């Protein structure tokens, strides 16, 4: 019991001596919430469960079943009859209660504890088990739905049977056949369980011993008044039994008395035994071999054969009517007392368990030759075959479940032929409709197959060898007749033999007759007809391959000769043609490739560029890079290779950044939507006139005040224009065109409604133009093309249209759907037409928003102002932003203190599609994040807290990435101390500039110098930054920012290098120069002159060369290289230089001199002396 006074399920089950699942089952029925054995319930609920279990007598049943466990071995509990006292006191059970009892009993039958086999037992216990085994079919009628249900208690009927010998082990192994196989129950015949007694040890059971009816009161009964067993024509009764309407218990009572009468006689007889009662069923089976192991249940499951009822009108002995054993194999005979297995000796005495008498097989198998005098052993156990038991579903191994009492096959279908007849001589007859054959003898039975259970597994049934050379196969097409007039050595005869090899193999197989054979023989003309015998498994009854018609004996075999095997030369020629075709298909180069995750293998890059991988490897080899087809390339290398093939490269994550991810309009806004101004983004290549076009639209001069004449920020403006007699508002976003500001362009595309693509008429389509097109397509926004600079000389708008058409942007004038307007930003031509086209396109888009809700939108740009603090440029996309609103922008929380429009005027609220600068954020938000206004600060803080954790993890990952040094870049340099690092601290004015600079730094080569960004943040340079730079030896780089008070003095005192830039070009160039300054200078050769040896003077052991200077001049103590022809014979220092026996420093062109080297004296006339010196040179980064 818990501290709160509740009781756990396992405690309650322990008190009640029950399993946890029983208590959980009761709780579920009482609608008490209990999920597992450790769940807690109240005392009231525990008392309800106890009362429920006491009413259902589950506790008593469990205790009693544990005590009588030895008496329940391999038995199926029947539903005992209640006494008169119980019938008076207990209410009548409903049908569904009986179903639950049946299911519980079936579960009891399958428990492992009841499958144990005991070697000894008392006769009284065995007799009681025999009574319980009379009714196994009752539990099998109802499919089990709740197998774990406990057994409800029922009073047992004490029966005093006649004492006889104890049961054998084979009897106690019967219920093992009813185990689970492949998720289904293989139900054994009811009579086979009673017939498992030994012939020499019969049991006498008095069927009239119980005084009360054995079936439950609510179960309907049926009286079988026919003297015969159940026949196929009695379909109504069989159907009722199969459907569970009729209890088969009375049928089982007759079996007991029949066994008693048969065991008394215990003699073989061919005549049927007279029944003692009208409702009895007769049992005929094979005797049991005692030496057969009894603990293998698969012997019962594998040796089952379906019952084949007799054909209407055919005589049928009542004792062996429903007996069906194993099928007769080809060449096997039915012998008296033998098993009839081909290839095995016939034994006298009882048959093996599970193997039926072959006499009954011959009677039930069509076309079998039954020998006269083969006795029917009455009273022998029927372990092998499935009996005609009503209501018990059977399952064939490998086949579907079917009813035992299957209706007979229509008369138009051909009857199956026994395998023994397949191998016999038959007269060739033309039987296209496959008529039925007459019975071979008046005593042979040809019953229709009623409860066929499919094919038997061939594991325990070895296939006998069929005759390899049958005497004659009339009408068969398996073996073609030998061609006449051809010698034995003829090749065609050998080809015939090879061709007929496969049918001969088929002929050696044994046909397994299944339940689908009737339909198949009707379709194929019979097994023993004109066509070849078909070997078919009943569980794999599928449409066979179409048969080849009869071949004309007179025609030569030419079809096989035409099939020539492909030679090696033909295969090589075919492969060369396929390779040539694939290369021709790859000649078309793509306009642009998208690189996912900043790396590609050589093979992937070759596929994208539509070139061979060897071309990529050759290109890299010329750059000093050894690569294989599986080696990964970084983005810089990919761009270098792609430039050689004239294909620009675009990063995949940049295109993903342009996609719209958040839907600003919610379901609750649909009723209050109104039209909103469109958001237009101006995009294009650098210096194509985007800002000048906006200046012409706004009638301002923004471009004149930009540093370097290029845009480095994203600007947002709102203008008003006249359209259709009314004033329309347009919101414009100006994006940078430089390649470093890719993220800015993607951010602008994500919030836009229409994209204006500016293309210079004199420059055409450029890389950033292609990137802008990809951004617009990723955001799924319409494109309006503005062909600018039409007033310049050499401009060609038609050429621009042609280049754009290659990018699937076809002008309306050429039959496309893209609006293209030629404009001049300087002269203001066609500006009004451009605005009109933009408004027309946006009207089609039907842009709407709900102004009467809390604002939602996107952070376009953000920066840190030294006077105002964090400032964010916000674009309201839905709702209205007001002063005082609590805003959460990503992980940053803020409260709007003031809002300023693009002109610097203060405003109190901003509606949809309105760009504003908002003040009041706790820190600088990240550009590109979505912002949302919350009703109170508490709700906003809850959202911001979760986002801050994610942002902190992302920031840490970025810092680790900045310190990452790849193994390939380190190689052997780290061990030699040659790996250099450049530490920088980056401060910029806005967040977008930081993104652009960091992205550009990533593109710099890092093979020998690693750029390590210690800190990157928007805002001015402070004293804290100076201290960090002094401690780490870093360089401070400022972009469009200023230094705080005291920072300049601190930098001078600490000797920190602070660089300030306004244009990104200069910043990146200086950082690259600083990286190159860290590299060790390299030594290069500088040529001085060339001299020719014309005479040789020996001086002691050494020699001096008399030379003539032909080019340049020769200096003393310089480096010299002696070449003899094309071979270098010496390279070293020039130690002595004389002219007219005087030492000189140098000798110019046209003069003679004497040259001597201390380490070389092997001069020859005609040698060339090249003089050079080594000088140091500043190294550059390897691109």
From Swiss-Prot:
Belongs to the TRAFAC class translation factor GTPase superfamily. Classic translation factor GTPase family. IF-2 subfamily. One of its GO terms (cellular component) is cytosol. GTP binds at residues 684-691, 734-738, 788-791. Gene3D superfamilies: 1.10.10.2480, P-loop containing nucleotide triphosphate hydrolases (3.40.50.300), Translation factors (2.40.30.10), Translation initiation factor IF- 2, domain 3 (3.40.50.10050). Residues 788-791 are annotated as: G4. Residues 675-847 form the tr-type G domain. This is Translation initiation factor IF-2. Residues 65-512, 540-579 are annotated as: Disordered. Residues 709-713 are annotated as: G2. Its main location: cytoplasm. PROSITE patterns: G_TR_2, IF2. It holds the Pfam family IF-2. Residues 544-553, 560-574 have a biased composition (Basic residues). The lineage of its organism: Bacteria, Bacillati, Cyanobacteriota, Cyanophyceae, Synechococcales. Keywords: Cytoplasm, GTP-binding, Initiation factor, Nucleotide-binding, Protein biosynthesis. Residues 684-691 are annotated as: G1. Residues 734-737 are annotated as: G3. One of the essential components for the initiation of protein synthesis. Protects formylmethionyl-tRNA from spontaneous hydrolysis and promotes its binding to the 30S ribosomal subunits. Also involved in the hydrolysis of GTP during the formation of the 70S ribosomal complex. The keyword Cytoplasm applies. Residues 824-826 are annotated as: G5. GO terms for molecular function: GTP binding; GTPase activity; translation initiation factor activity. It comes from the Bacteria.
């Amino acid at each position: 019991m818990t501290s709160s006074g509740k009781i756990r399920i396992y405690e309650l089950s322990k008190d009640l001596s029950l399993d946890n699942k029983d208590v959980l089952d009761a709780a579920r029925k009482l609608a008490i919430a209990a999920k597992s054995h450790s769940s807690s319930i109240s005392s009231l609920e525990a008392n309800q469960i106890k009362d429920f279990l006491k009413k259902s007598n589950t506790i008593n049943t469990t205790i009693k079943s544990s005590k009588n466990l030895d008496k329940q071995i391999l038995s199926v509990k029947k539903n005992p009859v209640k006494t008169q006292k119980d019938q008076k006191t207990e209410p009548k059970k409903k049908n569904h209660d009986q179903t639950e009892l049946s299911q519980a009993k079936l579960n009891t039958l399958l428990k492992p504890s009841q499958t144990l086999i005991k070697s000894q037992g008392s006769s009284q216990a065995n007799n009681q088990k025999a009574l319980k085994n009379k009714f196994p079919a009752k539990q099998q009628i109802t499919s089990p739905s709740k197998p774990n249900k406990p057994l409800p208690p029922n009073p047992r009927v004490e029966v005093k049977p006649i004492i006889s010998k104890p049961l054998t082990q084979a009897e106690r192994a019967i219920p093992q056949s009813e185990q689970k196989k492949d998720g289904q129950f293989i139900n054994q015949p009811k009579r086979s369980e009673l017939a498992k007694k030994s012939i020499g040890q019969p049991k006498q059971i008095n069927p009239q011993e119980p005084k009360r009816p054995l079936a439950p009161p609510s179960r309907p009964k049926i009286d079988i008044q026919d003297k015969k067993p159940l026949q196929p024509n009695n379909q109504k009764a069989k159907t009722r039994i199969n459907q569970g309407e009729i209890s088969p218990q009375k049928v089982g009572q007759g079996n007991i008395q029949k066994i008693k009468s048969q065991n008394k006689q215990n003699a073989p007889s061919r005549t049927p035994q007279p029944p003692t009662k009208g409702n009895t069923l007769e049992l005929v089976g094979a005797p049991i071999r005692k030496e057969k192991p009894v603990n293998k249940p698969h012997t019962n499951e594998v040796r089952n054969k379906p019952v084949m009822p007799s054909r209407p009108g055919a005589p049928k002995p009542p004792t062996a009517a429903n007996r069906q054993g194993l099928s007769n194999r080809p060449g096997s005979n039915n012998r008296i007392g033998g098993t009839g297995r081909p290839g095995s000796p016939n034994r006298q005495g009882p048959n093996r368990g599970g193997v039926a008498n072959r006499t009954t097989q011959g009677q039930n198998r069509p076309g079998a030759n039954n020998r006269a005098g083969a006795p029917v052993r009455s009273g022998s156990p029927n372990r092998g075959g499935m009996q005609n038991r009503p209501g018990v579903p059977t399952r064939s191994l490998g086949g579907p479940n079917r009813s035992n009492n299957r209706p007979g096959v229509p008369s138009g279908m051909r009857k199956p032929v026994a395998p023994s007849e397949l191998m016999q001589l038959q007269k060739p007859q033309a039987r296209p409709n496959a008529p039925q054959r007459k019975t071979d003898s008046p005593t042979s039975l040809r019953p229709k197959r009623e409860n066929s259970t499919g094919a038997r597994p061939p594991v325990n049934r070895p296939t006998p060898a069929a005759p390899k050379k049958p005497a004659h196969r009339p009408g068969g097409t398996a073996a073609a007749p030998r061609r006449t007039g051809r010698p034995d050595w003829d090749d065609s005869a050998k080809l015939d033999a090879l061709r007929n090899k496969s049918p001969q193999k088929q002929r050696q197989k044994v046909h397994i007759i299944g339940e689908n054979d009737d339909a198949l023989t009707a379709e194929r003309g019979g097994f023993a007809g004109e066509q070849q015998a078909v070997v078919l498994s009943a569980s794999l009854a599928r449409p066979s391959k179409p048969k080849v018609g009869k071949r004309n004996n007179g025609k030569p075999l030419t079809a096989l000769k035409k099939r020539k095997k492909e030679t090696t030369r033909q295969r090589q020629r075919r492969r060369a043609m396929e390779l040539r075709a694939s290369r021709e298909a790859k000649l078309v180069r793509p306009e642009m490739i998208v690189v996912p995750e900043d790396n590609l293998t050589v093979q992937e890059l070759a596929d994208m560029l539509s070139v061979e991988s060897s071309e990529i490897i050759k290109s890299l080899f010329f750059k000093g890079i050894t690569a294989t087809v599986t080696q990964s390339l970084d983005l810089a290398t990919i761009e270098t290779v792609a430039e050689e093939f004239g294909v620009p490269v675009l990063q995949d994550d940049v295109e993903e950044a342009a996609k719209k991810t958040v839907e600003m309009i919610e379901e609750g806004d649909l009723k209050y939507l109104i039209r909103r101004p469109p958001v237009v983004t101006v995009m294009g290549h650098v210096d194509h006139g985007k800002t000048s076009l906006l200046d012409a639209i706004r009638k301002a001069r923004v471009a004149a005040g930009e540093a370097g004449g290029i845009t480095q920020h994203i600007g947002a403006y709102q203008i008003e224009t006249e359209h259709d007699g009314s004033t329309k508002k347009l919101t414009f976003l100006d994006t940078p065109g430089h390649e470093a500001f890719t993220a800015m362009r993607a951010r602008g595309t994500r919030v836009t409604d229409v994209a204006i693509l500016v293309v210079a008429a004199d420059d055409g389509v450029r890389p950033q133009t292609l990137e802008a097109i990809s951004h617009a397509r990723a955001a799924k926004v319409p494109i309006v093309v503005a062909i600018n600079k039409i007033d310049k000389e050499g401009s060609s708008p038609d050429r621009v249209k042609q280049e754009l058409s290659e990018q699937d942007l076809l002008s309306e004038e050429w039959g496309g759907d893209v609006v293209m307007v030629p404009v001049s930003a300087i002269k203001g031509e066609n500006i009004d037409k451009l605005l009109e086209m933009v408004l027309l396109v946006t009207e089609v888009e039907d842009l709407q928003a709900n102004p009467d809700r809390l604002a939602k939108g996107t952070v376009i740009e953000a920066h840190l102002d030294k006077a105002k603090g964090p400032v964010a440029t916000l674009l309201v996309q839905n709702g209205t932003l007001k002063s005082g609103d609590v805003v959460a922008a990503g992980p940053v929380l803020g409260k709007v203190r003031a809002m300023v429009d693009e002109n610097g005027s203060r405003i109190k609220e901003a509606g949809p599609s309105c760009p504003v600068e908002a003040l009041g954020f706790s820190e600088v938000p990240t550009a590109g994040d979505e912002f949302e206004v919350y009703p109170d600060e508490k709700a906003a803080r809850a959202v911001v807290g979760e986002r801050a954790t994610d942002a902190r993890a992302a920031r840490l990952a970025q810092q680790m990435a900045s310190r990452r040094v790849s193994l390939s870049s380190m190689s052997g340099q780290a061990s030699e101390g040659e790996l250099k690092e450049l530490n920088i601290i980056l401060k910029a004015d806005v967040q977008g500039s930081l993104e652009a600079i960091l992205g550009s730094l990533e593109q710099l080569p890092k093979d020998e110098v690693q750029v390590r960004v210690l800190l990157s943040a928007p805002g001015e340079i402070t004293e804290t930054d100076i201290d960090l730079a002094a401690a780490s030896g870093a360089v401070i780089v400022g972009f469009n920012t200023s230094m705080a008070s005291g920072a300049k003095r601190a930098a001078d005192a600490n000797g920190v290098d602070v660089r300030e830039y306004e244009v990104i070009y200069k910043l990146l160039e200086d950082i690259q120069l600083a990286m190159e300054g860290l590299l060790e200078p390299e030594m290069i050769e500088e040529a001085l002159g060339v001299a020719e040896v014309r005479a040789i003077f020996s001086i002691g052991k050494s020699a001096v060369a008399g030379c003539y200077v032909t080019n340049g001049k020769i200096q003393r103590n310089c480096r010299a290289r002696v070449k003899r022809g094309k071979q270098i014979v010496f390279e070293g220092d020039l130690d002595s230089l004389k002219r007219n026996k005087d030492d000189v420093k140098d000798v110019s062109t046209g003069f003679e001199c004497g040259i001597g080297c201390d380490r070389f004296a092997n001069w020859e006339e005609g040698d060339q002396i090249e003089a050079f010196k080594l000088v140091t040179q500043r190294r550059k980064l390897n691109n």
